[in-house]
């Protein structure tokens, strides 16, 4: 009987990508098959996120639930990876001594040998080092699971925003070689992928070296990926305003495969708070970039990230954030109450804003962002949208679902499963809070 792998992933798209590569790696080297039940597993992997405090607490809660499984089956291997593992290293075993393997985002390629070593030696295996980007040299070709796929183009971040742990958990920015990324995209396209999302913590800072020694930026990469036969839609995330270049704006205007949607985190609408965050740009500079983009690509959808309650945030600072929201007109966006991350400069700042006030501000901000996002959805009613059909509807097996360019789920009646993995034109009939309803055009 084949041995089983259970994997749970917390956090961002980069973690989702890493988890998929771990599945590929362990499938090839140890013939592990994925199971949906942790209690059936021979190996349990937890790929963690440390962006927010509650995410970190969630790690230890989950490990605590698996303790009984380990006691019942001592041969089971429990491995913890991702950013919490990178940040805490061997200290994870202080709170969860039954964990066998601890590895970081840059050492996931060592998983097979670490698991084997844990079994043979009965000793914990810990490697949270930063061997730059060598992990990609040890990973098998990615398996294809549906018409959409993530492709990691770079690792780490060198911006060192004062609130963020990424430079400490994933290391400095390192771009994958241009031709390696292209080879992965070609492989995916040859196996039925129609849409790729190019990933990086600061993806528009991509600087990949080509086979002839030239340095290519993200705009160069997008143009070449768009020319790959079978790739009809390109997304990328996450971007930093500082490196949202004119060449990237030009690519948005000239490359039809690049979606009319941009996720560009701003975090705050207060220049004072942006400076304290070490974002190194102003709200005026942010809006200037977006004005230039919208002039080049009318109707493009803009989403963002917001942090509410950063240390020292005043009522005026928050009002400036709300003003920025009105000035820009965002699509559905992500927003959170600030939580201090150990080891970051912001964790040492005085935070005298009451938690109740932070939550009140967050509720007001989310309410307005949701209003703006729903208004964009409402304006789409009556339009014809080209969607990539991805799966059956989650609520009705007689319906299929797909995504628009601006990342909205569309559910529509259809009895032809062969449409999954293809593009289709759908008339938008109705806007709902978290999705759209449509009718397939024949």
From Swiss-Prot:
Main localisation: cytoplasm
EC top class, as a word: transferase
Entry EC number(s): 2.8.4.3
Transmembrane segments: none
Domain MTTase N-terminal, chain residue ranges per copy: 3-120
Record text on cofactor binding: Binds 2 [4Fe-4S] clusters. One cluster is coordinated with 3 cysteines and an exchangeable S-adenosyl-L-methionine.
Record-listed [4Fe-4S] cluster 1 binding positions: 12, 49, 83
InterPro entries per UniProt: Elp3/MiaA/NifB-like_rSAM, Methylthiotransferase, Methylthiotransferase_CS, Methylthiotransferase_N, Methylthiotransferase_N_sf, MiaB_methiolase, rSAM, rSAM_horseshoe
Keywords: 4Fe-4S, Cytoplasm, Iron, Iron-sulfur, Metal-binding, S-adenosyl-L-methionine, Transferase, tRNA processing
Catalysed reaction, written as an equation: N(6)-dimethylallyladenosine(37) in tRNA + (sulfur carrier)-SH + AH2 + 2 S-adenosyl-L-methionine = 2-methylsulfanyl-N(6)-dimethylallyladenosine(37) in tRNA + (sulfur carrier)-H + 5'-deoxyadenosine + L-methionine + A + S-adenosyl-L-homocysteine + 2 H(+)
Keyword Signal (UniProt): no
SMART domains: Elp3
Positions bound to [4Fe-4S] cluster 2: 157, 161, 164
Keyword Cytoplasm: yes
Cofactor annotation: [4Fe-4S] cluster
Highest taxon, organism lineage: Bacteria
Ranges where the Radical SAM core domain occurs: 143-375
UniProt cross-references to Pfam families, sorted A to Z: Radical_SAM, TRAM, UPF0004
Molecular function (Gene Ontology), one example: 4 iron, 4 sulfur cluster binding
TRAM domain sequence ranges: 378-442
Its biological purpose: Catalyzes the methylthiolation of N6-(dimethylallyl)adenosine (i(6)A), leading to the formation of 2-methylthio-N6-(dimethylallyl)adenosine (ms(2)i(6)A) at position 37 in tRNAs that read codons beginning with uridine.
Summary of subunit composition and partner proteins: Monomer.
Protein name per UniProt: tRNA-2-methylthio-N(6)-dimethylallyladenosine synthase
Gene: miaB
